[in-house]
């Protein structure tokens, strides 16, 4: 049978999602815990491979198993075998047409900036600290240039392996909640480092170092070297993955937990 899981994790202690030899990964920890519950080797497929230090509240994975277990085994049972910074939020049996990556129609990320003169002691791994007076409204206006299907060469990592730089951004908004500035962006898919590169350039606009038209200018240039530095990983969360209604996957609060949803 095929099982889908909703996963939440604090990525600060891991070398990213993907299983790697000799370093700790989210995938490695999950596969180990699932294999114990299933009493057989389990291999996972995920909706989005997050980088080192990046978190998720809405990661979706699937796996094949011959084990017959109830929902509690795949949630509470697996959680009992996981470290405290990884948790299964839900489990659902799905048909064989479902694939965590290829069935997804959109991914949604939130980037959380703690905008204060002094660095935080609490939540330091869950937010990115930037001082200076950030104008979230200017960032929001500038970000609207990203909407639609476009060439995002200026915002892809040099080592990105995607065959095409084109992605379709469905929505993007920048808001402020007190000391937090949140960049919320949804697209059909994302290039390597695309969200963090976008945030890095939006910050330059929010800090008054670049004009409102800069995002549009960067898109036209198609040159990564012209954009700003990549934003830090610790403020980034994969918060949601969209699938066709036929799969009826659970929908929970997006998070992260300390934010207004």
From Swiss-Prot:
GO terms for biological process: tRNA pseudouridine synthesis. Its EC number is 5.4.99.12. Keywords: Isomerase, tRNA processing. GO terms for molecular function: RNA binding; tRNA pseudouridine(38-40) synthase activity. Substrate binds at residue 109. InterPro entries: PsdUridine_synth_cat_dom_sf, PsdUridine_synth_TruA, PsdUridine_synth_TruA_a/b_dom, PsdUridine_synth_TruA_C, TruA/RsuA/RluB/E/F_N. It comes from the Bacteria. The keyword Isomerase applies. Homodimer. Belongs to the tRNA pseudouridine synthase TruA family. Formation of pseudouridine at positions 38, 39 and 40 in the anticodon stem and loop of transfer RNAs. This is tRNA pseudouridine synthase A.
